[in-house]
Every structure is written in C-alpha cells, then in structure tokens.
Amino acid sequence: MEQFNAFKSLLKKHYEKTIGFHDKYIKDINRFVFKNNVLLILLENEFARNSLNDNSEIIHLAESLYEGIKSVNFVNEQDFFFNLAKLEENSRDTLYQNSGLSKNYTFQNFVISEGNKRAYEAGVRLAETQDNEFSPLFIYGETGLGKTHLLQAIGNEKFRNFPNARVKYVVSSDFAQEVVDAFYQRDKGIEKLKKNYENLDLVLIDDTQIFGRKEKTLEILFNIFNNLVLNKKQIVLVSDKAPDELIDIDARMISRFKSGLLLKIEKHNLSSLCEILTVKLKEKDPNIQITNEARHDAAQISGNDVRALNGIATKLLFFAKTSKQNLINTENLKEILFEEFEKFHKKSFDPYLLIENVCRRFNVPMDSVLSENRKAELVRVRDVCNYLLRQKYNMQFQQIGKIFKRSHSSVLMAVKRVAKMIENDSSLRDVITSLVI
C-alpha cells in the first residue's frame, strides 16, 4: 500500500494544474493490484478513466516505483475483476514458463522402486507442503537413475498443489552462466540475481557436482542458500556424488548441503527397469506391444540407465512406425538393438541382473538362490546361474564363487552338471538359450 500511495502522490503532483482532479478522482482510490507487471486500478468515473488511460506520462510515473511494469490500466468494477482473473491466469502461465520445468516429468510417470522410494516420498512431501521440514533435500546417485525426472516432478507437483508458487529449476552450469552474465550487467546485476532467487518458494538445482572450481559461483550460491534457509524456503539439490565426495567445493558449502535430508538413489532392479521401459513406450505410442521376454532383454542391456532406456524406446518406436509392426518380440528386438547387444556382450555387465532374470524364469526367490539353502530346486537354479555366468559371460570361477559363497571346484562342478543336463534335456536347453541376451 505504501508503494501505491507513493504512486498516488506522483499523480497528485502531475495533475496539480488541473484544479480538483486529484481530490475528486484520485484521492479516494484504494482498490488496485500489481500482478504480472501490470498495475490494475479500480476507478468508476469514465471521464477520469479515459483521461488517465490516454495519458502516456502515467506509465513513466509508475516505472519509478514498480520495477518491470509494462502497463497501468484504470478500469471499472466489472472490468477490474475480469482483468484480475485474466492477470492471475497469465501470472500462473508466466510463473511456469520462467520455472525452467518440463511438463514431461511428473510423479505420475515416475516409476517407484526400492532404490528410489525414500527419495520419492521425500519429494512428494515437499511438493505437498510449504514448510521446509526436509529442506535442503540433497538427492544423489549414479548417472541415469532418474534423478532429474524426480527433481522436475517435484517442481511440477508443487505447481499443481500451489498454482502461484515461485519455482525455479536450474542446472548448475546454467546457474554459473547466470552469475557470469550478472557481472557484466549494470545496475547491480549480482544483487538482482540474488534477489530473484531469494524471492523463490522452491529452488531445484541439478548436477550439483559441476559447481567444483567455480569459486565466484559458489560464493553467490552460498549467500543465496543461506538467505533461502533463513527465510524457510525449500531447496532440493541433485548430484551424481554424495556431498563428502564432491571435488573442489569448500567445506562450508558441503556443510550446507548436509544440513537437511540426505538421500541416495540406488540402482534399479530388473523389474523396475522393465516397468520404466513400459512407461516410456506407452508415452511414445500406446499401440506398441512388447513381449515379456523382449522387455526383460531390452531392460537388461540398458546398463541400469533410464536415459538409455528412453533411447531404446525411441528405437522401438522407429521400428514400429517404419515396419508397420506394433509387436516387439525377442527376434526383432535383437535386430533393432543389434549395436546395443554387441556393446552389452563386450562390456562388463551386472551379474545380479542375470541372476534376477533366471530366478524370475524359474519362479524362485533370488535371496534364496544366493543363500546356502540346499533344497533341490534352489540348487538347480543356482547351477544354471553358475553355468550362464561362466559359459556365456566368461566370468572367472573365483568371481562366481564369491557371489554364491562357493569354492572354485563347486562352481566348476555346477557348470559341468548343467552342461550335461542340457545335452539330454531339450526343454532346459531352450530355457537357458532364452535367458542369454
């Protein structure tokens, strides 16, 4: 109100030569709103409205008080509420456009697994409230585990729950560039940058590990971070590394990162990777169908990388569109993803994903197979795992023995048993062949 009263004083001075204009039309104005860089003022008298709206000097008076103002509109009561509703809608649109978020990342299409469940729950809690109970929230984990998806989903859910929230998603390299640009601006560019961030309700920072060796950027971030915390604002940071593993970031900044809730996202299991691939395919084209075997194979060669899964889904979409075939099976999958299969066989793979796949095929618990339980059905599945790891993936007997807590000779005997069995059992041979990707 103080700012608007100052504006009225400027109007009074501007119209001092127009006898009675201020006292009759301006003095008693008390309904106004400044939103989305527009100053909307309720004024019932049509003559006064027209006079003020036609005066090009009015906007210049307002510019001295309202930073970034684009227009001053004097309207009647009916138009006031109509324009107010429109301004609020435009304001929400502008808030989202300036947020840096993508509508593609939501909680609805985020696949929850044991590895990300706690981080997901913390994100949901933060998006549903305006308190800073878990802030700063620091989420870390290896590349390709869906951290960026979760981070942006938090922002999108915040907008869904609080349409007028001020949210900003920024990658650390982009923030560093903002700092550089601010240094070259006149009129206290750095102070404006700080103010812009400190006025936010929720700040989402991606790739925090890249901040290393950017001393000036870290200094600015430190100041912003402190003020956000002091003002009980919400902060979420995402990194490939835990705070203590970050390189070239000083201790006081590390301490700030660790001052809230610290959560790690673990690798996905095979079933979660399969579900993620299903979601990705459905998003691209709900008509594409994929067999369970093909889905498992595609998930296994993804390297536990959600981005790689998205690339696989894109290739499957391209195949479906160009070949007019909507069903993906193991045969055409190996044709479509020939390069991916080649790379998978050449590089080191995760033996536990294979073991999980075998256990699913034989319908036995993976933890039982990895235990020392000697039940016949578990021994058989354990032997099959040993055989595949040795014969198809060329793992050393000692490495296999370490996984199953068995001796070199025990693994060797298991491999020989399975080799002999598949000579006489065609159904087992077919099953083992299908398990090799």
Swiss-Prot record:
It holds the Pfam family Bac_DnaA. Its main location: cytoplasm. Gene3D superfamilies: 1.10.1750.10, 3.30.300.20, P-loop containing nucleotide triphosphate hydrolases (3.40.50.300). GO terms for cellular component: cytoplasm; plasma membrane. ATP binds at G144, G146, K147, T148. Residues 72-99 are annotated as: Domain II. Residues 1-72 are annotated as: Domain I, interacts with DnaA modulators. Keywords: ATP-binding, Cytoplasm, DNA replication, DNA-binding, Lipid-binding, Nucleotide-binding. GO terms for biological process: DNA replication; DNA replication initiation; regulation of DNA replication. CDD domains: AAA, Bac_DnaA_C. One of its GO terms (molecular function) is ATP binding. Oligomerizes as a right-handed, spiral filament on DNA at oriC. Domain I is involved in oligomerization and binding regulators, domain II is flexibile and of varying length in different bacteria, domain III forms the AAA+ region, while domain IV binds dsDNA. Plays an essential role in the initiation and regulation of chromosomal replication. ATP-DnaA binds to the origin of replication (oriC) to initiate formation of the DNA replication initiation complex once per cell cycle. Binds the DnaA box (a 9 base pair repeat at the origin) and separates the double-stranded (ds)DNA. Forms a right-handed helical filament on oriC DNA; dsDNA binds to the exterior of the filament while single-stranded (ss)DNA is stabiized in the filament's interior. This is Chromosomal replication initiator protein DnaA. It comes from Mycoplasma genitalium (strain ATCC 33530 / DSM 19775 / NCTC 10195 / G37). The gene is dnaA.
